[in-house]
A protein has these predicted regions:
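Hydrophobic alpha-helical transmembrane segments of multi-pass membrane proteins
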Residues: 9-16, 203-207
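Juxtamembrane or sensor-core-proximal signal-transducing alpha helices
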Residues: 141-158, 179-194, 203-236
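Short, strongly hydrophobic alpha-helical membrane anchors
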Residues: 1-7
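Histidine-centered phosphotransfer motif of kinases
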Residues: 239-240
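Juxtamembrane segments at transmembrane-helix boundaries
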Residues: 12, 20-39, 52-172, 185-191
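Primarily extracytoplasmic/secreted proteins
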Residues: 19-23, 44-47
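Alpha-helical transmembrane segments
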Residues: 40-49, 171-178
Length: 240
């Protein structure tokens, strides 16, 4: 009994660390300022909610439910703390940290880790190894944003066109669908053309990775075009 309780406390601790790291990534992406105290309390709140569900509604405490609940949590956090930024962009801010981290982790787990003798089945059955890959993926997501010089915090000022708004809605919808397929549905219960759930996940990850990077590139180009137009207008006014 004591061993199970200590193991449970270990999982709670790992959950809090994971949520706090994800909140820090969210704050970095959206430029919505979160102090350490707020990050800690928000992380603790979501984990305590999970503990309550696990205690009183154990039948509903599944991996799929927990993952979708965390996604909803980040969207609600973005909508609450990001006002008065337009809702579609706040939803983007809420979805992006979870989806980018998931894409990086899934790519590593499916295509890189097996090269070092760590197949998906081994990682998925080892909780601490899975958490380790997740935390590592959060750090890689941070460096991904830094490497490609994405300034998502400026998008609310520079995504002004109707086309950009539509692209943002498509991006949000695709991120939610990806997360639902990878984390909200038990793919092992599906049988698509005789493929295993692992093969199906690999196809989804590769397909969405290409789609996601394409959508980000288009949106980023829209932002830069708007900035160039603004700079051109300012220079013309200075000349005149």
């Amino acid at each position: 009994m004591l061993e199970e309780f200590l193991q449970f406390l270990g999982f709670v601790f790992l959950d809090i660390i994971e949520i706090m790291l994800m909140l820090k990534l969210f704050s970095f992406i959206s430029a919505i300022p979160f102090r350490f105290k707020k990050i800690f309390y928000l992380g603790l709140a979501i984990v305590l909610f999970q503990v309550v569900v696990w205690t009183f509604l154990p039948d509903y405490f599944t991996v799929e439910v927990v993952m979708m609940e965390e996604l909803l949590f980040f969207v609600l956090i973005a909508l609450y703390y990001g006002r008065p930024i337009k809702p579609s962009l706040l939803v983007f801010y809420g979805l992006l940290p979870m989806v980018v981290t998931s894409l990086i982790k899934q790519f590593i787990v499916f295509f890189i880790a097996p090269l070092f003798g760590l197949p998906f089945t081994v990682i998925s059955q080892n909780t601490f190894l899975s958490y380790g890959f997740l935390c590592f993926s959060i750090f890689l997501a941070y460096f991904f944003v830094k490497l490609y010089h994405y300034d998502f915090s400026s998008w609310h000022q520079n995504l002004k066109s109707v086309m950009a708004d539509r692209l943002l809605l498509v991006t949000n919808g695709s991120m939610f669908l990806y997360y639902l397929l990878l984390h909200g549905i038990d793919l092992s219960s599906l049988n698509w053309f005789g493929m295993t759930s692992t093969t199906l996940r690999q196809i989804i990850v590769i397909f969405y990775l290409i789609l996601f990077l394409t959508l980000l590139a288009i949106l980023d180009r829209k932002v830069k075009q708007h900035l160039l137009q603004q700079n051109g207008s300012v220079k013309r006014k200075e000349v005149s």
